[in-house]
Amino acid sequence: AVHGDARGYFMETYNEREMKEAGFDIQFVQDNQSMSTKGVLRGLHFQKNFPQCKLVRAVRGEVFDVAVDLRSNSETYGKWYGVILSSENKKQFLIPEGFAHGFLVLSDEAEFCYKVNDFWHPNDEDGMAWNDPEIGIEWPEVVGEYKGSASAEGYALKDGTRLNLSDKDQMWSGMKLSLIHISEPTRPRLI
């Protein structure tokens, strides 16, 4: 909950007891923060053998945040969930293990924070194309035409800002849905 008055606001961003009462017994081990400029698209990332649960939020600016279900035993396998996270709406998005994750920066700049329940394992990192037509993510403000690769070439935001992906994010060649399995399906949730 956000408690505000004329002086500003106070917001509790994580409460272990309340998470457990809601059915989430998650032990977070690391907090991360990134800053990105408008048009940057990070993702879609996942770890195959060390899947991460993430609790994400934008502390400055606005992003469109996406989770894609990679659990082959799930009823929602291959489906995506997207939500606007911003410093204005103060929403958080809980992404369970077994999902690919990414976000697109919609504001001039955005600072993005996330808690994870496992450490980064560089040799286990993998990804998938942000524009895979089988998934069909409806990225807001993005215009362009699918050219059969994960490249950002030919894509921009409606205001003309070029879409900006890292070299690594451009090399992901497609969906790898069968790589991650978790035992109990859990849907991403706004909290």
Give the residues covered by each predicted segment.
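Short alpha-helical functional segments enriched in proximate histidine and acidic residues
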Residues: 102
